[in-house]
Swiss-Prot record:
Designated name of the protein: La-related protein 1
Top-level division of the source organism's lineage: Eukaryota
Entry-linked Pfam families: La (PF05383), LARP1_HEAT (PF21071)
Subcellular location per the Swiss-Prot or TrEMBL entry: Cytoplasm, P-body
Transmembrane segments: none
HTH La-type RNA-binding domain span: 573-665
Compositionally biased residues, Basic and acidic residues: 55-74, 86-105, 184-198, 286-303, 415-430, 870-880, 919-928
Length: 1150
């Protein structure tokens, strides 16, 4: 038996301990007490737990077997003993010793238990197919006596037969457990066998020597695992693993076991991964069976002879994931706390690689030695992935699921997204604020709101009254009054302090007021503090006695009501000299050259000589903030050297070049001055032909000499659309007044342009604003004429009669008909001409045009008309009435507010600068062209190329001329007397704005005169003449934007007449008007005429009218709603696009 090598225990195989590590003294001690220890392990598992093999447990930890739960190795050793003791009969002699040892150790078991725990039902290390049989054997083992223990060992023998590794023989009396390595591969061990060896993993220190004496076979002391690294509180020397390992050694005889047997036993273990549902380490995949190659590799490694260092190297490879076993199984569950490698799970067991400790999240830990409470949930298969194991089994503050080791069988799966292992449903149970509950609408009532009325209270109150039933419904609220009140409050100066108040006491009051306002209005800027030296000293009382500084009079410390507006930033001076200096500097700045260059408001208010009333200056906000004393302002200005005062002392102006600043055309309205009103009558009373053309000739000089003139017109343009519906001119006369003397019309114009308070009659917001002068009456016809041009869809004949047509003179024409210059083909030239025509029209409507027309020798007028002719009443109404200038008195009336003055200014600008009906329409609609140039084709068409059938593409193209128009201001005058040309009497003089047209020898004519001339040319020279074609072209373009019924009827009548005799230019121009005019403004009667004329034209074999109808139906937005004649529909279906009209039909080609 000596040649037999003893079989190592499974704990030694797993831990890889060298047998030479044990001391000789321990070997002798194990040999003496081996009988007692073996009996203790066989009879009952509680007894074995009372005396656990500490040394063996410590050796397991050193070898890295921290993953195996407690009790698994012991259960295997029992199976091994059963298999070995079947042929051996020496085991019976050891029974009495085992019985005695069992009786002695039982009382020690009770104090070892730290915490109560349920008995485990499943052995996580070995789950075999013979699970039921092994469970029954384990139950019998607990109840039977010593003979029953022997029978249990014998019945367990067939289980050992599965082991493929040979079992080394040893003395049975010394080593009862050499069979442990063989059952490692077995799977027949029941789960219940796990309960007993793991019930008490810790034993008292007193039992340590008893277990140590039992192990005789251990010749060396096993190195212990530093469990302080795992649990932090168990020392290697006192760990119960030593007891467990020493107790385990009693199953092995005291004989020596070679390392070769250790490796054979290790290789014989079944490493198949049959566990299902076990948590994985990092792989996350299901466990798979190991291949036969892995088993062969393990067997080859077990059969090799190696030293203890070689075995340690093998286990180090296993830890570092370098062994073949670990390489083939990457989905193993590993304990991160104890660095365990071996595990049993789901009926299989095997080695597992070591995984780096990643916070212990995915790696279950075996039960610690300090925790005696075990259950079947201690196996790694019951630990959820997202739960970190608690290394300290005694952590009582930990969750119940993780307390006592890895007891996670009752732990509920926590939500990953909720802290402390909570679940999603727990959030709803927790109280939340109202703004966090988004699942429903939260009524957020105002806590200060009164309680809601009950049904009885609502019934008692009854329904709400109607607005009509409420008495005193008209509150007569005046918005302008409110604004003026705020205006006066804003610019109102703070009150002076009482002169009898001591400066020191006044400063105290100001500090108190500042503190008071700061507490209620933290955003208010601090009130400027007044220094004592700025305040006037106390005045002398009656009798010449000065009041003492600290008199006994009570001081009123009440804080007055703080105004809405902030107080002025600068303190108000208390002396008149300082105040005059401030006022003088402020007014001098108004009249400085720097300010006048940009202050158009002052320049419009100036008279011809540059004067402005002092009352106007006194009403400015900055001046009013300094003082409202009119006499003080006059006194301050008398000492000024930078402003000049008028002889009467009521007006001031700039001292240097005062006449260059006024903007004369806009001087009128509420703040008009007596300068223009006093000089204007003298100009209008002049008679003679020289005075007639003076206003017209003086206008270009004014525009060229004054650099501010263009700026004035830009100001007027910015107010387009604001003067809609207002009367525009006082020079318009009715048919009854056409032949009245021109002096009467002059007087009306004079009264209309220079009346002081004319603006009050044209602004509803300031009705009754104080204008006392009589407003001149406007002629009725002018109102009707202009309103007809604005409000009606059609332009009246009275507007057409004011048209001024500009066409090239006949001298520019040649036989080829190409009269246009090179500049006319450029877009820049056309744009400049367009701008010049608009400016010319504005000036025609702005500057009054007075012309002396010879009247009849005999005429009768009334007395009123005679007085108006003389201009007596107008002179009184205008020049004799001085402007309302307040007198220098103490009771100065409050000037008009800024709102009123702005409204007056807008009204004055819109009235004094009238706009033509065309400009008013353009302010509401899009702009219309006033110049119609000739757009010649870029290159002549080839004779063989397809083209449209129109007169321009014929062999003899018609003569076309550009044409322009502007709207004049006066109606067409009657025929001029003998000796005066019609054009010179009705057309205004040439203007610089149309200098480009004058360079190209354009001639301007009144529309009626030009039309008659064209009709005469048509009658005398034939239907196809240049003048008539120009008239057709003008009608075609002008009627698209400005439709006039009479003009259209005449256009259509003459075009159809020319078409009957073969002249096509007029009918083609008519078709162009139909197509583009209906697109801009659809008129049903015009559309009917369009289809009728096109039908007639198509029946004659022409296609131009059909092409324009086709183009209109394609561009029109309402084409689908229009009804087309059946004949035209059939003809239109022959063409798909406008390009198809270039190709003539086959019938036409033949």
């Amino acid at each position: 038996m000596a040649e037999k090598q003893p079989m190592l225990s499974f704990a030694k195989v797993v831990s890889g301990q060298a047998e030479d590590a044990s001391s000789p003294s321990q070997q002798v001690q194990h040999t003496q007490d081996s009988s007692h220890s073996s009996t203790q392990n066989e009879n009952s598992q509680p007894e074995k737990q009372a005396h656990p093999p500490h040394n063996r447990r410590e050796k397991e930890n050193v070898g890295g077997r921290s993953e195996r739960p407690r009790g698994e190795g012991k259960g295997k050793r029992r199976n091994n003993r059963k298999g070995d003791r079947k042929p051996r009969g020496e085991t019976k002699t050891e029974k009495p010793a085992e019985k005695v040892a069992t009786e002695e150790v039982k009382p020690v078991e009770i104090p070892v238990v730290l915490e109560p725990a349920p008995l485990p039902a499943i052995n996580a290390w070995f789950k075999n197919k013979e699970e039921a049989e092994a469970a029954a054997a384990a139950a019998q083992k607990e109840q039977k006596s010593e003979t029953a223990a022997d029978q249990f060992i014998i019945t367990a023998t067939p289980v050992v037969q599965k082991s493929s590794a040979p079992i080394p023989e040893k003395k049975r009396a010394v080593e009862p457990t050499p069979k442990q390595a063989a059952p490692i591969k077995e799977k027949s061990k029941s789960r219940e066998s796990k309960k007993e060896p793991w019930k008490t993993s810790t034993a008292p220190a007193a039992t340590a020597p008893v277990t140590e004496t039992v192990t005789v076979a251990a010749t060396q002391d096993w190195p212990t695992l530093a469990k302080a690294e795992l649990n932090g509180h168990v020392s290697p020397s006192n760990s119960d693993d030593n007891n467990e390992s020493s107790s385990n050694s009693q199953h092995k005889t005291g004989g020596k076991m070679t390392k070769n047997s250790w490796k054979k036993v290790d290789i014989s273990v079944d490493y198949g991964s049959k566990g299902k549902g076990a948590p994985r380490g990092n792989g996350g995949e299901k466990g798979t069976r190991r291949s036969a190659n892995d088993e062969a590799v393990r067997r080859r490694s077990g059969e090799e002879d190696s030293a203890s260092g070689d075995e340690q190297q093998y286990w180090s490879r296993s830890k570092d994931n370098k062994s073949p076993i670990n390489e083939m199984s990457s989905d193993r569950v590993v304990d991160s706390g104890s660095n365990g490698i071996y595990y049993q799970q789901g009926g299989t067991h095997g080695w597992k690689k070591k995984v780096n400790n990643k916070a212990g999240s995915d790696m279950p830990t075996p039960p610690n030695s300090t925790s005696p409470h075990q259950s079947e949930s201690n196996s790694p298969e019951h630990l959820p992935k997202d739960k970190a194991p608690i290394m300290n089994g005694n952590a009582k503050n930990a969750p119940a699921a993780n307390r006592n080791g890895n007891n996670t069988s009752t732990a509920k799966t926590g939500d990953y997204w909720h802290k402390n292992g909570g679940e999603r449903k727990e959030d709803k149970s927790q109280p939340k604020a109202y703004y966090q509950r988004n699942d429903r609408f939260q009524a957020r009532a105002n806590p200060h709101a009164p309680p809601k009325l009950t049904a009885a209270q609502r019934k008692e109150r009854g329904p709400l009254p109607r607005w009509e039933d409420i008495e005193a419904g008209d509150d007569n609220f005046d918005y302008m009054t409110l604004m003026e009140a705020q205006y006066s409050q804003y610019y109102g100066a703070p009150q002076q302090f009482e002169h009898q108040l001591d400066p020191h006491q006044a400063s105290i009051l100001i500090q108190q007021a500042q503190q008071h306002m700061a507490s209620f209005a933290p955003f208010r800027p601090p009130m400027p503090m007044l220094s004592p030296h700025l305040m006037s000293p106390p005045l002398d009382r009656d009798g010449g006695v000065t009041s003492p500084v600290s008199n006994g009079e009570p001081i009123n410390t009440a804080i007055p009501f703080a105004p809405i507006y902030n107080p002025p930033t600068a303190p108000r001076p208390v002396t008149d000299d300082t105040l005059k200096e401030y006022v003088r500097k402020q007014i001098e700045y108004y009249f400085s050259e720097e300010n006048l260059q940009k202050d158009f408001f002052l320049r419009r208010k100036m008279g011809p000589e540059g004067y402005l009333p002092v009352a106007l200056i006194a009403s400015f906000p900055r001046v009013r903030s300094l003082t409202e004393d009119y006499s003080l302002i006059l006194e301050a200005l008398k000492d000024s050297t930078k402003v000049d005062m008028s002889p009467d002392g009521l007006q001031i102006r700039a001292p240097v070049n005062p006449t260059i600043w006024p903007l004369m055309p806009t001087v009128s309205g509420a703040d008009s001055l007596p300068g223009p009103s006093s000089q204007a009558p003298q100009q209008f009373r002049q008679n003679g032909p020289a005075a007639t053309a003076a206003p017209v000739e003086s206008q270009p000089q004014a525009s060229s000499s004054k650099p501010q003139q263009p700026e004035e017109w830009e100001e007027v343009k910015t107010r387009k659309g604001k003067g809609k519906g207002r009367l525009t001119s006082g020079s318009q006369s009715t048919n009854d007044n056409k032949r009245q003397p021109q002096q009467q019309q002059k007087s009306l114009q004079q009264s209309g342009s220079d009346q002081p308070d004319l603006d009050f009659q044209f602004d509803n917001e300031i009705s009754g604003g104080g204008g006392s002068a009589q407003t001149p009456k406007r002629p009725e016809k002018s109102k009707k004429a202009f309103l007809s041009a604005i409000d009606s869809e059609e332009i009246g004949d009275d507007v057409i009669s004011k048209l001024i047509i500009m066409t090239p003179s006949r001298r520019t024409l040649d036989r080829t008909g190409d009269f246009s210059t090179r500049s006319q083909n450029q877009g820049e030239f056309n744009e400049e001409v367009e701008i010049g025509l608009r400016r010319y029209e504005e000036e025609l409507w702005t500057v009054p045009q007075e012309k002396d027309i010879p009247t009849s020798k005999v005429s009768t007028i009334s007395a009123e008309q005679f007085n108006e002719m003389r201009g007596n009443e107008d002179a009184k109404k205008t020049s004799d009435e001085p402007p309302e200038i307040p007198l220098p008195s103490g009771t100065q009336p409050t000037p008009d507010s800024v709102w009123t003055k702005k409204a007056k200014e807008r009204a004055a600008a819109s009235v004094t600068v009238p706009k033509s009906p065309m400009q008013r329409r353009e302010s509401e609609e899009q702009k219309m062209n006033r110049f119609y140039p000739i757009s010649k084709p870029t290159a002549p068409l080839d004779a063989k190329s397809p083209r449209k059938k129109k007169t321009r593409h014929s062999e003899k193209p018609p003569v076309e001329m550009p044409v322009a128009w502007v709207l004049g201001r006066e109606d067409a005058l009657p025929a001029a007397p003998i000796g005066i040309a019609a054009s010179s009497s009705q057309v205004p003089a040439n203007h610089p704005s149309i200098s480009l047209l004058q360079e190209d020898r354009f001639v301007q004519n009144v529309y009626s005169t030009w039309r008659q001339a064209c009709l005469k040319q048509r009658k005398s020279l034939g239907y196809d003449c240049a003048e008539m074609n120009t008239l057709y072209r003008f009608w075609s373009f002008f009627l698209r934007d400005n439709f006039n019924r009479n003009m259209y009827e005449e256009f259509r009548k003459l075009a159809l007449e020319d078409a009957e005799i073969g002249s096509r230019y007029g009918i083609e121009a008519l078709f162009r008007f139909y197509s583009y005019g209906l697109e801009k403004k659809f008129r049903p009667e015009i559309y009917k005429n369009f289809m009728k004329d096109v039908t007639t034209d198509v029946q004659k074999g022409e296609l131009y009218g059909l092409e324009k109808l086709f183009a209109f139906l394609q561009r029109s937005k309402i084409a689908k709603q229009l009804v087309v004649d059946d004949y035209l529909t059939k003809e239109l279906n022959k063409y798909k696009s406008t390009d198809d009209f270039r190709n003539l039909p086959q019938s036409t080609k033949k």
